[in-house]
Amino acid sequence: MCSILCYAGKDVTKETMEGYLLKTKMRGPDAQQVVETEFGYLGFARLAIMGLTPDGMQPFQRDGSWVICNGEIYGFRKIKKELEERGYQFQSGSDCEVLLPLYEEYGLEMFSHLDAEYACVLYDHKSGKLIAARDQIGIRPLFYGYSKSGKIAFASEAKNLIGWVDEVRTFPPGSYYYDGKFVKYEDIAAVHGYVHEDIDVITKNIHDKLTEGVKKRLDADAPLGFLLSGGLDSSLVCAIAADILKKPIRTFAIGMDTDAIDLKYAKEVADFIGAEHTEVIMTKEEVLESLETVIEALATYDITTIRASMGMYLVCKAIHEKTDLKVLLTGEISDELFGYKYTDFAPSAAAFQEEAAKRIRELYCYDVLRADRCLAANSLEARVPFGDLDFVRYVMSVDPAKKLNTYGKGKYLLRKAFETDHILPENILWREKAAFSDAVGHSMVDDLKEYAEKYYTDEEYETLRRKYDFAQPFTKESLLYREIFEKYYPGQARMVPDFWMPNKSWEGCNVNDPSARVLANYGDSGK
């Protein structure tokens, strides 16, 4: 994980830009620098993952052109070898050094061909144009805004831009900026033809593509570990990785000191795959003391994002403080592809598919945002195998009638895909889903709600919530989060499109809390 900063103007000093960059030093604690160029400034804070020597420090320059990138370019060694055969030379082992040669070869077409999680800014010396781009899902963050002089600025996080741009805007995923315009190079959720193969063929493809997605993300020069909740998704990632590596992996789980639900399942998985497992216990006091820090790191007021981030932030904090790890593989993006508890209520296959596409397109505002910020705030890099582009494209193209829960078990295709591998205990593979914010302990969400209820009187709540026209708070908990958000990001609420909620237009989903606990089909989930 790194931090990038670009300003296409020179009406500020280099020292001022250095100050803006240092607001996200935790993203790149290994080295930081701001370079003045012919068009403005480029800043980079480095967390060394590939090519650990100083030669891998950015920006990279070639024939007057520049690039900065927070990303992982998968398969870069093969790309690098091909470029070397064409006469290109490289100074480092960094994967991102291939970007300028790739741009010279393919121009703007480069972005649609990258197998990567990335956010980058590139200056083309020949055309004098500034270019920025972001991966199709938005796994790596990127924001932009305009200074008082009308010059554009780009940054990894909103906090880099607060106070000196007019409005902090989210850079759209799957897009590039060129010559003052944003161009969509791929809508990853769009389907150009459905797969109507039988279940056995579909599940084999799911198996093989997810396995390859995990394998790609095991490539790192820095030490890596795994977040293991004990739920299906993170357990699969860990089990696949352990099977590939044929050696013990390092896994980490977190739970409340009072009623942790998932810790026993995480330990069962860790023991089964032979992992070096660490449990982190959190308390009510730690959750409440960390709340403001977490909201500042997230730059959101969304209820479910914040709830789910409390455990993730605290386990990552422990990993940062007590280990040498720099990379963590996580289980995000499975729900959006295969379904949440609430998608059991989808009225039709078409409705399920439409909802999945919506969730994939909004990932960068919610689950992917959470994974990035909770890890980056603790100088760790998130890698998300379920976000592998080939995997996402395939699952989105599977006939939605086969993805509907008509099997009596959610995520049936994913479970079935690994049924014969025996890399997980059967009870884990077929366990009911529980939301992470609930699975760390039901008491955590209850503690947050109770704290908010006591924080405001009913009169204060009614008065304060009316201050906000956009995404108006509707509970004391949501008001508390919004007030903390506004303290650090005043007037920037539109960075978040809305509160994450189940599809209220569906029967059984018209609820006022994002937790699956309020759904009629929760059943044995979270037990």
Question: Locations of the language-model features?
Answer:
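Hydrophobic (often cysteine-bearing) scaffold residues that line and stabilize catalytic clefts
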Residues: 13, 92-95, 114, 199-206, ...
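Peripheral terminal appendages
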Residues: 157-159, 200-201, 209-224, 439-527
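Short, amphipathic alpha-helical segments that act as regulatory/interfacial helices
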Residues: 6, 100, 104, 314-320, ...
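Mid-to-C-terminal catalytic subdomains of enzymes
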Residues: 325-330, 334-355, 362-473
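Amphipathic alpha-helical segments that form well-ordered structural scaffolds
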Residues: 98, 209, 269, 394, ...
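Cysteine-centered catalytic environments shared across enzyme families
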Residues: 1-300, 322, 326
